[in-house]
Amino acid sequence: MEETHAIWIEKYRPRVLEDIIGQQEIIERLRSYVAKREMPHLLFTGNAGTGKTTAAVALAREFFGEDWQMNFRELNASDERGIDVVRNQIKQFARTSPFGGSTFKILFLDEADALTTDAQSALRRTMETYAQTCRFILSCNYSAKIIDPIQSRCAIYRFRPLGRQAVSEMVKRISADQNLTVTEEVIDAIFYVAQGDMRKAINALQGAAILGRDISPDMIFAITATARPEEIDDLIDLSLAGNFLGAGSSLQALLHDRGIAPQELISQLYRAVVKRDLPEAVKVRLIDSLGETDFRLSEGAGSDIQMQSLIAKFVMYGGRNSR
């Protein structure tokens, strides 16, 4: 296996816009900016691993060519959330002249939704003041956390979770380059684990590749500490059938023997419940219980008792439905 020490999410990160998999409508619009040699401020919003950072860097590469690193700067707002990062680092970059004859520079601010409201207000003023010399690309997971005055000054692009076809294409491309054997079942497992996040998909493949060239679904689930879909289904079946001891035993095996994080398990249970053919009243109660348990865990409650309580509620709701 070549370059086993390399981080694959960086090695296989697309360098130009046309190599980005998925988000085709967005990519076409970004390419039109390059063709016109002009662009507005941009706001990229969407889940992690959907291509926001990759698109921003590729756009800068195509705008500036060999000078792209001189005219592009990337900052992460979660590192410094306050107004000082705007007054110092951002303003200092925005006010300097572009390099190499370019008409503007690009500042990419990742996780912009982490900025405080005061910092965002200062950023809005900076965007207005230096619009002639600097274009801003803001990236966030939640656009609702970006103040309206900034949103109104940006062209907004919503990056959707990547579909199975996009994940499959990237997995097959990497597998061919790394001489790995993957089946459609393996791709299904990677897609289930990644949930539209290409970084997760590539990391899962690289983690499994350490164990051997012939990748199996079990390797994917093991390396990512994820329960198989059928294990989640079995846990729900036992609970709704009123088998509290059996469900509790399965729960303990997943949490302690397999090392699956409680909140990851809640996420998987939620996905399974949503897809299930259940009476609406039962589904509502189950999802409400999942949300309550997730909140309690985020507040620091003990995971074992909260997860057992969750299963107990599943058993109760299943029993009521059977009467």
Swiss-Prot record:
One of its GO terms (biological process) is DNA repair. CDD domains: AAA, HLD_clamp_RFC. One of its GO terms (cellular component) is DNA replication factor C complex. Part of the RFC clamp loader complex which loads the PCNA sliding clamp onto DNA. One of its GO terms (molecular function) is ATP binding. ATP binds at residues 46-53. Heteromultimer composed of small subunits (RfcS) and large subunits (RfcL). The keyword ATP-binding applies. It comes from Methanospirillum hungatei JF-1 (strain ATCC 27890 / DSM 864 / NBRC 100397 / JF-1). Pfam families: AAA, Rep_fac_C. Belongs to the activator 1 small subunits family. RfcS subfamily. HAMAP family: RfcS. This is Replication factor C small subunit. It comes from the Archaea. Keywords: ATP-binding, DNA replication, Nucleotide-binding. InterPro entries: AAA+_ATPase (IPR003593), ATPase_AAA_core (IPR003959), DNA_pol3_clamp-load_cplx_C (IPR008921), DNA_Rep/Repair_Clamp_Loader (IPR050238), P-loop_NTPase (IPR027417), Rep_factor-C_ssu_arc (IPR023748), Rep_factorC_C (IPR013748), RFC_lid (IPR047854).
